[in-house]
Regions:
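Glycine- (often His-adjacent) and acidic-residue-rich active-site loop
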Residues: 27, 54-85
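Charged catalytic carboxylate motif
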Residues: 30-34, 82, 89, 189
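Crotonase-fold acyl-CoA enzyme core
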Residues: 92-200
Length: 232
């Protein structure tokens, strides 16, 4: 399950199990609940603050929990709507958010990164990838709007329709990430960026973000059903 650490006024949300490396950090329903609980804890803190998300080992996050999905196909629409709530939470979070992408970010994990204000990626290893086209899995209304709004149009076309794997330098060139640095500098670089923005924390920032992301937020609030999503 995810856990929190803190560096000064910056909260660091680790997406995997404490003390373990190379977890895929997939979005199991329990993981989603735990993530929301930790974000509640961060929001309850008073004073200047910012948020960094990261993980340890090979994966930032591999996205949807496919094992859970195939065991619960009848619950897939509700599960996807629950995933949307994490993206929504980050898009309107009342403090600066920075994804420290130290490993692979695939599928919904790539979307988790793009739902944050800024992204720092490892430059020498790891990929940013949307493999849905190769898995015969469509994007939900909310996911599609998130990606086409947060990426440039041609980058979205390439990423969503070809499943291209972007290494750090390519992701930087495509505007997917804001920095691509050596592996041992990813977290420090993200924390430094977040630290410079702790004074922006507050309701005004949430209002600004809601105005900026209104179309995405409305799309993420669209209920997933057979009229707009068909898997398999």
């Amino acid at each position: 399950m995810p856990y929190l650490n803190r560096q000064g006024d910056v909260f660091v949300l680790y997406l995997g199990n404490e003390g373990e490396t190379d977890n895929e950090n997939r979005f199991h329903p329990d993981w989603i609940d735990a993530t929301h609980a930790l974000l509640d804890e961060v929001e309850a803190h008073e004073g200047p603050a910012a948020l960094v998300t990261t993980a340890t080992g090979k994966f930032y996050t591999n996205g949807l929990d496919t094992d859970w999905i195939f065991g619960n196909l009848d619950r897939l629409p509700g599960y996807l709507d629950r995933v949307h709530t994490v993206f929504t939470r980050l898009l309107e979070f009342p403090m600066a958010t920075v994804a420290a992408v130290q490993g692979h970010a695939f599928g919904a994990g790539a979307m988790l990164a793009i739902a944050q204000d800024f992204r720092v990626m490892r430059g020498d290893r790891g990929y940013y990838c949307l493999p849905e086209v190769n898995l015969n899995m469509p994007f939900t209304v909310g996911m599609s709007t998130l990606l086409t709004s947060r990426l440039t149009r041609q980058t979205a076309v390439e990423a969503m329709t070809t499943g291209r794997r972007y290494g750090g330098p390519d992701a930087l060139a495509a505007g997917i990430v804001d920095d691509a640095v050596d592996g041992d500098r990813v977290l420090d670089t993200a924390v430094a960026r977040a630290s410079a923005l702790v004074s922006t924390r507050g309701a005004n920032l949430t209002g600004i973000k809601r105005g900026m992301h209104r179309d995405i937020l409305d799309a993420l609030a669209t209920k997933t059903d057979e009229s707009n999503f068909k898997f398999g």
